[in-house]
Amino acid sequence: MEEKEILRRQIRLLQGLIDDYKTLHGNAPAPGTPAASGWQPPTYHSGRAFSARYPRPSRRGYSSHHGPSWRKKYSLVNRPPGPSDPPADHAVRPLHGARGGQPPVPQQHVLERQVQLSQGQNVVIKVKPPSKSGSASASGAQRGSLEEFEETPWSDQRPREGEGEPPRGQLQPSRPTRARGTCSVEDPLLVCQKEPGKPRMVKSVGSVGDSPREPRRTVSESVIAVKASFPSSALPPRTGVALGRKLGSHSVASCAPQLLGDRRVDAGHTDQPVPSGSVGGPARPASGPRQAREASLVVTCRTNKFRKNNYKWVAASSKSPRVARRALSPRVAAENVCKASAGMANKVEKPQLIADPEPKPRKPATSSKPGSAPSKYKWKASSPSASSSSSFRWQSEASSKDHASQLSPVLSRSPSGDRPAVGHSGLKPLSGETPLSAYKVKSRTKIIRRRSSTSLPGDKKSGTSPAATAKSHLSLRRRQALRGKSSPVLKKTPNKGLVQVTTHRLCRLPPSRAHLPTKEASSLHAVRTAPTSKVIKTRYRIVKKTPASPLSAPPFPLSLPSWRARRLSLSRSLVLNRLRPVASGGGKAQPGSPWWRSKGYRCIGGVLYKVSANKLSKTSGQPSDAGSRPLLRTGRLDPAGSCSRSLASRAVQRSLAIIRQARQRREKRKEYCMYYNRFGRCNRGERCPYIHDPEKVAVCTRFVRGTCKKTDGTCPFSHHVSKEKMPVCSYFLKGICSNSNCPYSHVYVSRKAEVCSDFLKGYCPLGAKCKKKHTLLCPDFARRGACPRGAQCQLLHRTQKRHSRRAATSPAPGPSDATARSRVSASHGPRKPSASQRPTRQTPSSAALTAAAVAAPPHCPGGSASPSSSKASSSSSSSSSPPASLDHEAPSLQEAALAAACSNRLCKLPSFISLQSSPSPGAQPRVRAPRAPLTKDSGKPLHIKPRL
């Protein structure tokens, strides 16, 4: 409630002040009063205050032939250039005077004005009438400085009926001051009130003497658009300004020229400067009819309360009731927002916003005619950043080009259909101001300066084509005739030329096309979607255009093929196999195709290749159709040529892979042929990829036994005995091998060790160092009579058909091959039974030892390898005498044990015992005595055997 009461009071004060000012200074020159006699800035509590003086010299001193020379001289910068310093100092003097308690020097035709924003979101605009009591010298000096400062003629810029005038004045951030007096009754005051649920209304209040000293903030709005002419009977609330308040920092540069600009009316009073508190507020004209029209003007204000980077189009048009439009995007809208914001209140040097005393008399837009209803477009931005000052300097272009060509590219898509007259009145749209021509805002944190030499083709479209606008949620596009998409935007990237942005691709244009006329740019998209081009939509969205369409396009016939043909060739060469029947219409049957293309041949680099499913074979012939060869060389526009290249590439890769594999197969692997090593021959012969080394062939077992009859070198096995090729001696594993020249390897291996796979192949390179069993017999089959691997087992499976015959009739351990093989195989079986029989072998008799060795099935299951037979036969002679001695020795040591053992074994092995027994009983004691130590010595090797 408190805020509402304050708002009402401010509205009353503003309205009364305006009415009093009009009654006092209607059509006469403003009466001169001391500048600081009655008005000081209001209380500065928490906001910012901007106070400025606006020198208003009479028009009669201006020349009428200077043109737009002010553009080269003045700009909106952080610190004004040299020529603008005197007015800037004048603008700050009143505040310094108010702060120091000294009245500022009165100047003739100087309006002092203050625009503030209270806490209740109300805009308060104070206007101090010009003083007459100034000294002649001061006014003369001021007049001279102003005439020197303002060189632009105003005779051709006087507003006609229904037109405004370019704003003039300066706005500079002032230091925080506290008012020590009250405003005089003559001070006009404009209050923009925002009531809940209603648009903001600007009213004038007369007396401000009792206005409360609330903290006020200076309005630094983004846009102000003012309509100069209205019907005398209508008070349209839709026309006026939008004094949008931004909650954070306010972009002052965008609104300063309009917010604090003045209007002069030449209806019979050309000498009298008529002040205006705000261009958007009710103007105080000097003419009677316009006074009647504009005295009761109600201006609709709209506040943008978004805290994001949201931008709106704010329009003041008598034809459209809409006052705001949403912008296309924050990035594009930011291009039209001046980044020079108000500085902190405690800083001395702040960004100064100069609405030039001689504002920029731009040419009106091409679509606006004299007498047409003027419309203004402004970007209204609300930025959440509360930056105190801006370090960027807005500098106008020094060139005399048309500044409309330096607008942002999105202005070409700006809504201009219902408001065609963009800049006909004096209040130019903000898009035409100099700050936007020099810089382009890419994001919130980065400002990129555009090159002054760039002339964007879409920039001239804001006034040329008043096409209907379509306002959508995501974009603001112009609807052009016969155009389905938005017009392409040409971006300027440094050192890379223009890049054409369309929906799906970025195309870099050559530097020669950096400066395109408007017609060429408008026809740029028409060429891209020419009716003569084919558009083939597939799953991958591939667009194929015939080369005749881009090559015959009239706007740029020379530079087009450089980038267009490249893109066409790229799009064709991507998915040629899928597109070929569609794009070329059965390209093999084309009338211009050579004969060899339809027969599965392809010409690659002038050489014919026959293309099959997986092979590309080169032919000796040359293509007879010579006319097609240049077409194939420039195959970027020839889908068949590109297809042949693609097929050739795949076929070549496949053929190379085949050759590589064949070469790898031919190479000799670093492995020995298992067939050659085991059997001495290989059926593949020289085609075998493995190594055939005669030194690694297995030893002939018959040669070891001395029974090989092929001693002339025809034996496929090796007659060179080496222990690397021989299996492990089974007697050595038992600990009973007494042959000093045993050809078998004497190596201790674990009982649990697996069979060496290399030895199975015929040769183990590790030899005696191998920790695996070097055997050719299957231990599982030898132990249990069955192998779990079955036919896949690589070891020998010897049957036990000779076991019963050997157990019944075998006279000695070694004469029969089956016995020898069984003993070799017994070395690979479990050795516990043999260990348990050692005491019986030492103490009772040799008959018990041999009986246990022969009768135990784990020791002698099945047969053994053929090499072991020779070993058994060779060791039989040496081992025949120790069993006999042991047999004679046993009864003398323990006859009872011998009798019990013999009684137990006689039934099992009667023939064996009878063979070992001596015929003469008297010879037994004689033989036993000398053989007793031998028995102890012969038993010692049994303890050497490891128990792993």
Swiss-Prot record:
Major place of residence: nucleus
Positions with biased composition (Basic residues): 56-74, 441-452
Pfam family, one: zf-CCCH
Membrane-spanning parts: none
Biased composition (Low complexity): 128-141, 372-398, 847-856, 864-885
Highest taxon listed in the record's lineage: Eukaryota
Gene Ontology CC annotations of this record: mRNA cleavage and polyadenylation specificity factor complex; nucleus
Subunit structure: Interacts with SMAD1, SMAD3, SMAD4, CPSF2 and CPSF3.
The protein's name: Zinc finger CCCH domain-containing protein 3
Upper lineage: Eukaryota, Metazoa, Chordata, Craniata, Vertebrata
